[in-house]
């Protein structure tokens, strides 16, 4: 995973509607072209890093990249959970993401409860790791200062 940190941005699109409704863990979804342009050596799995919506504040996040085996998805997706409570949905806004580390491979779960428990564990682990000085400095990266009108993959 020599591509980490990896920076990308794209417009938030509607996903399957499962994050908030079934899991109680809202996610922002990237369009297919952002997922399709991920470097080949960023394998599927759960990652952590920083995210902002538009030119808003930068928050901790976890992101799932892959097919979500529990739901048997047929299309690869990139679903970001930002550790912040937003007042309203932000479909159509630009999501800026800096992936800084890898937590675990994606895997199937035998129940919705075990999936939720794993995600909650991922969130807690990401919160800890993002306090490391080498990860905190990425929160201040110029990537997050770019105007809303610039949409690009990479840095």
From Swiss-Prot:
Zinc or magnesium. It is found in: Cytoplasm. Gene3D superfamilies: Riboflavin kinase-like (2.40.30.30). Mg(2+) binds at residues 27, 29. SUPFAM superfamilies: Riboflavin kinase-like. FMN binds at residues 104, 107, 109. Catalyzes the phosphorylation of riboflavin (vitamin B2) to form flavin-mononucleotide (FMN), hence rate-limiting enzyme in the synthesis of FAD. Essential for TNF-induced reactive oxygen species (ROS) production. Through its interaction with both TNFRSF1A and CYBA, physically and functionally couples TNFRSF1A to NADPH oxidase. TNF-activation of RFK may enhance the incorporation of FAD in NADPH oxidase, a critical step for the assembly and activation of NADPH oxidase. This is Riboflavin kinase.
């Amino acid at each position: 995973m020599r591509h980490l940190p990896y920076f990308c941005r794209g417009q938030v699109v509607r996903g399957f509607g499962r994050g908030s409704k079934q899991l109680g863990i809202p996610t922002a979804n990237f369009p297919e072209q952002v997922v399709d342009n991920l470097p080949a050596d960023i394998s599927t799995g759960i990652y952590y890093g920083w995210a902002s919506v538009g030119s808003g504040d930068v928050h901790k996040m976890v992101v799932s990249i892959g097919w979500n085996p529990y739901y048997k998805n047929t299309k690869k997706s990139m679903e970001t959970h930002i550790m912040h409570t937003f007042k309203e949905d932000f479909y159509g806004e630009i999501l800026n993401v800096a992936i800084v580390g890898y937590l675990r491979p994606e895997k199937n779960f035998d129940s919705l409860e075990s999936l939720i428990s794993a995600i909650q564990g991922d969130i807690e682990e990401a919160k800890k790791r993002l306090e490391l000085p080498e990860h905190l400095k990425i929160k201040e990266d110029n990537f997050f200062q770019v105007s809303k009108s610039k949409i690009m993959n990479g840095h």
